[in-house]
UniProtKB/Swiss-Prot annotation:
GO terms for biological process: lateral root development; positive regulation of auxin mediated signaling pathway; regulation of DNA-templated transcription. InterPro entries: Homeodomain-like_sf, Myb_dom, MYB_TF, SANT/Myb. Expressed in roots, stems and flowers. Expressed in dry seeds. Expressed in root vasculature, root tips and lateral root. This is Transcription factor MYB77. It comes from Arabidopsis thaliana (Mouse-ear cress). GO terms for molecular function: DNA-binding transcription factor activity; transcription cis-regulatory region binding. Residues 155-167, 195-224 have a biased composition (Low complexity). It comes from the Eukaryota. Plants overexpressing MYB77 exhibit stunted roots and shoots. Transcription factor involved in auxin response. Functions in auxin signal transduction and modulates lateral root growth. Interacts with ARF response factors to promote auxin-responsive gene expression. In response to auxin, binds sequence-specific motifs in the promoter of the auxin-responsive gene IAA19, and activates IAA19 transcription. The IAA19 transcription activation by MYB77 is enhanced by direct interaction between MYB77 and PYL8. PANTHER family: MYB PROTEIN-RELATED, TRANSCRIPTION FACTOR MYB77.
Amino acid sequence: MADRVKGPWSQEEDEQLRRMVEKYGPRNWSAISKSIPGRSGKSCRLRWCNQLSPEVEHRPFSPEEDETIVTARAQFGNKWATIARLLNGRTDNAVKNHWNSTLKRKCSGGVAVTTVTETEEDQDRPKKRRSVSFDSAFAPVDTGLYMSPESPNGIDVSDSSTIPSPSSPVAQLFKPMPISGGFTVVPQPLPVEMSSSSEDPPTSLSLSLPGAENTSSSHNNNNNALMFPRFESQMKINVEERGEGRRGEFMTVVQEMIKAEVRSYMAEMQKTSGGFVVGGLYESGGNGGFRDCGVITPKVE
């Protein structure tokens, strides 16, 4: 098999192709290609149909033909055989070559110009929007404060409404203004002072001697509350439960409770601080206790 020849056809090849077409007709391209070394049947067919056939129009395409090709291509796409049937004497290959070499460039050029124009306009719009947004984002905000240009550390701040002119003799004066933050100080509620009368038990008890001054009553009440917390709370409960009708029985119980608490307290005081009792009588024995109230005083060393 001879090597395939690529490139333009020579005059000798064209003459040989015409003779073979007259001999075999414009159909048997395989037999025709055997008489032309290096050319395939397809190459012979294209050369004949596009260039050498007497039916092919070699005149330039008219503007009417160009308009027909452009309209048909917009409708049919790249179906060149279908488009060529709309033109007398034009082959599909001729129409395709004319489109690729001339019409496509013209149409794409016009479209390209329009597209570029629109694209430039579209590109300008975002740029304008970006520039506006950039300017607005970084525009100086009037905060009502004025920074001193002559301050070494730039900390001096003053009200912009009182900015002195550079030529003013008071241009060196700056009034620092505090900047209020986003914090709200909630005042603490004042403690509610409860009267001692609402917390005192219905029955007032005291360890002081009869005839003692009333000035030490509040102090004694506080000491009693500290010394006998269990007794005080339990006494309140008993008063509420028993009522006024059984007051006599309740007082007996209260006296027994007081004796027990005093004994416990005195025993603890003797162990810790070495205190002693003055003004009271103590009964010894299994049922011993304090018959009368006395004053507890610390031992003086």
